[in-house]
């Protein structure tokens, strides 16, 4: 590993089935990388599970999800709890997540927004969490949505409105959460494998990226682009220290499938405060926001993301005392300085 860094300038390592390695080995790799010039900028993450029970020396502890508390806080893991709460189990094509009906996943989605870090969590810092909704294994996000929404299983090439709405909410959870966001290539244009959930054995016509879908799914592609711009613009969305988690305030909402939080900015941020509101229900709903240490909320907000568009340019303004969110949609609000 050190040779690859020094000779080939590799700046990141992903460990497949990291649970087959032991904690001591992984932590030693991290220490050795950190000792190099600029070594602390090298990314290190992996899958915190093993396909089979690991063969280790007596007393060794596997570097898996159940032992994340023993790993360096500079080693990140794919958080499959985030993946499951967003879209449902990857092992059941018809199971649903928060984005399409599983209201009981609200608490897990809140944890996802915090990167699963906190004083009572084995995750020390949000940057230990890789937030994602899909990867190379299992169904693509779009195919999973088609199946879970009980759509035509052959309609993978149709930008179904319900699936588009669910996909946008999934993207918002991943890209506006604390931690490290991860996307499967092509997720932003509804990548499909024609319903193949185990495509390592499949031909190129299944696994290829169909670039023509960028035109077909232009609305979704631009939505991902806009959410990335929002994350880049407002630094508290990508805080590495945990400060944002402590200042993030969730609203108390009695209706199911609604989540809302505010997050204050720093003095150098272009926004004094941001708010994220999700409504995965089938009804338009109103919400009252709360703030950190009762910091005054603005009288008006700029809407920078809604059901159709996302970005850093204001789409319109709304009054703080009259915030409504359409069914199966999100709002991202900004208090611009």
Show where each model-derived region lies:
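Active-site neighborhood of glycoside hydrolase catalytic domains
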Residues: 1-55
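Alpha-helix termination/capping residues and helix-transition junctions
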Residues: 6-9, 133, 176-177, 322
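Short acidic (Asp/Glu) and glycine-rich catalytic loops that position anionic groups and cofactors
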Residues: 9-12, 143-152, 200-208, 242
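The substrate-binding groove and active-site-proximal loops of carbohydrate-active enzymes
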Residues: 11-21, 150-162, 208-214
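Flexible loop/turn segments at secondary-structure boundaries
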Residues: 14, 20-25, 51-55, 139-141, ...
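Extracytoplasmic/secreted proteins, especially bacterial periplasmic and envelope-associated proteins
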Residues: 24, 28, 169, 219-222
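Conserved alpha/beta catalytic core and glycan-binding cleft of carbohydrate-active enzymes
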Residues: 30-31, 40-189, 198-200, 253, ...
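Carbohydrate-interacting/catalytic domains
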Residues: 161-164, 175-189, 193-337
């Amino acid at each position: 590993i050190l040779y690859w860094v020094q000779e080939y300038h590799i700046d990141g390592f992903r460990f497949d089935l990291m649970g087959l390695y032991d904690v001591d080995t992984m932590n030693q790799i991290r220490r050795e990388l950190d000792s190099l010039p600029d070594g602390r900028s090298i990314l290190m993450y992996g899958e915190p599970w093993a396909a089979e029970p690991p063969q280790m020396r007596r007393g060794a502890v596997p570097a898996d999800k159940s032992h994340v508390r023993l790993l360096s806080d500079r080693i990140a893991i794919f958080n499959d709890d985030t993946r499951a709460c967003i879209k449902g189990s990857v092992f059941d094509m018809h199971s649903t997540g928060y984005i399409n009906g599983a209201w009981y996943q609200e608490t897990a989605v809140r944890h996802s927004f915090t990167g699963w870090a906190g004083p009572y969590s084995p995750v020390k810092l949000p940057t230990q969490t890789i937030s994602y909704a899909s990867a190379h294994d299992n169904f693509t996000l779009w195919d999973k949505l088609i199946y879970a929404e009980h759509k035509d299983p052959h309609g993978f090439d149709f930008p179904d409105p319900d699936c588009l709405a669910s996909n946008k909410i999934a993207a918002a959870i991943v890209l506006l959460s604390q931690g490290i966001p991860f996307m499967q290539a092509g997720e932003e244009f509804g990548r499909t494998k024609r319903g193949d959930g185990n495509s390592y054995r499949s031909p190129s016509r299944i696994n290829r990226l169909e670039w023509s879908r960028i035109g077909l799914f232009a609305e979704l592609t631009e939505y991902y682009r806009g959410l990335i711009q929002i994350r880049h613009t407002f630094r508290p969305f990508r805080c590495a220290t945990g400060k944002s988690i402590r200042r993030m305030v969730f609203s108390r909402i009695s209706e199911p499938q609604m989540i809302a939080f505010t997050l204050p900015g720093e003095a150098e941020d272009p926004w004094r405060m941001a708010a994220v509101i999700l409504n995965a229900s089938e009804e338009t709903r109103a919400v009252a926001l709360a703030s950190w240490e009762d910091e005054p909320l603005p009288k008006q907000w700029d809407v920078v993301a809604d059901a159709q568009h996302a970005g850093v340019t204001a789409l319109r303004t709304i009054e703080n005392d009259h915030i409504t969110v359409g069914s199966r949609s999100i709002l991202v609000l900004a208090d611009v300085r």
